[in-house]
Amino acid sequence: MAMSSGGSGGGVPEQEDSVLFRRGTGQSDDSDIWDDTALIKAYDKAVASFKHALKNGDICETSGKPKTTPKRKPAKKNKSQKKNTAASLQQWKVGDKCSAIWSEDGCIYPATIASIDFKRETCVVVYTGYGNREEQNLSDLLSPICEVANNIEQNAQENENESQVSTDESENSRSPGNKSDNIKPKSAPWNSFLPPPPPMPGPRLGPGKPGLKFNGPPPPPPPPPPHLLSCWLPPFPSGPPIIPPPPPICPDSLDDADALGSMLISWYMSGYHTGYYMGFRQNQKEGRCSHSLN
């Protein structure tokens, strides 16, 4: 049997509509290899055929509603279970101490049973220390031990939060020169954070020597006027005296009142140190004069 020399060698001829990609069709290597036109056409063709079949009723459209599962009937309680439930409800009586969940916040509080309605299986409890009265189901009442355990858990959580806050405050207030002063009171007078006077250079003269009228640094300056305090930033925690902080780096977070308060405080502190320096120089001058007279 002779085979024809032409053609594709006896293979089944390919249909042009079903060919999505053919390699070596004479295109150059620079052609766009990401051309997905054929894929888009095939997708549109598949979608169109599906819509056509759906329109003719060959495919049933699935509804978006979930299938309803048959409800499970509650298991019938036998007589022994009913007796146990009745016994658990009968154990509470008026005046018993218990723990109840307050409906406002969902927390457990100690309470005392004021009245009981066994027909409705409810009771009225009075919260210890608060005096609030609330109706509760007898099955929802808890023993006082549950309340104690809940308080222990709440106290542990509060202690953990307080320790976390104190740790954050100590890390923020720690400086290279003062690392041991971690615990500081919440409020302090104004002069507690004034900067210390500069150290006295050279040997310091003791009290009682002739010609000495300026002994040591001057007393701390009085608090600034109230109108300065109203413009100043919130007070800093007490502790060793520190230098007033510079103004914030970001100018957007500083309004006119804060900037004015910072400027007035800087003038006030500058005057304090200027007075100390002038007094120190006057002390040195009078000391030299007294030594020359002797």
UniProtKB/Swiss-Prot annotation:
Region ranges (Involved in homooligomerization)? 252-280
* Start and end residues of each stretch annotated as Required for interaction with RPP20/POP7: 97-209
Q: Where is this chain compositionally biased, Low complexity type?
A: 156-166, 206-215
Specify the effect of residue 274 to A.
Impairs homooligomerization
What happens on changing residue 266 to P?
Impairs homooligomerization and GEMIN8 binding
The reported result of mutating residue 127 to L/F is: Impairs binding to substrate containing dimethylated arginine
Q: What is the effect of changing residue 116 to F?
A: In SMA1; abolishes the interaction with ELAVL4
Please tell me, according to the UniProt entry, what happens when changing residue 136 to E: In SMA1; impairs binding to substrate containing dimethylated arginine; abolishes the interaction with ELAVL4
Q: What is the reported tissue distribution?
A: Expressed in a wide variety of tissues. Expressed at high levels in brain, kidney and liver, moderate levels in skeletal and cardiac muscle, and low levels in fibroblasts and lymphocytes. Also seen at high levels in spinal cord. Present in osteoclasts and mononuclear cells (at protein level).
What effect on the protein does mutating residue 279 to C have, as reported in its record? In SMA2 and SMA3
User: Where, per the database record, does this protein carry Phosphoserine?
Assistant: 4-5, 8, 28, 31, 187
Q: Which residues are recorded with the post-translational modification N-acetylalanine?
A: 2
- Any domain commentary? The Tudor domain mediates association with dimethylarginines, which are common in snRNP proteins.
By what name is this protein known? Answer: Survival motor neuron protein
InterPro entries cross-referenced by the UniProt entry: Smn1, SMN_C, SMN_G2-BD, SMN_Tudor, Tudor, Tudor_SMN_eumet
Modified residue annotations for Phosphothreonine: 25, 69, 85
Q: Where is this region: Disordered?
A: 1-32, 59-88, 156-222
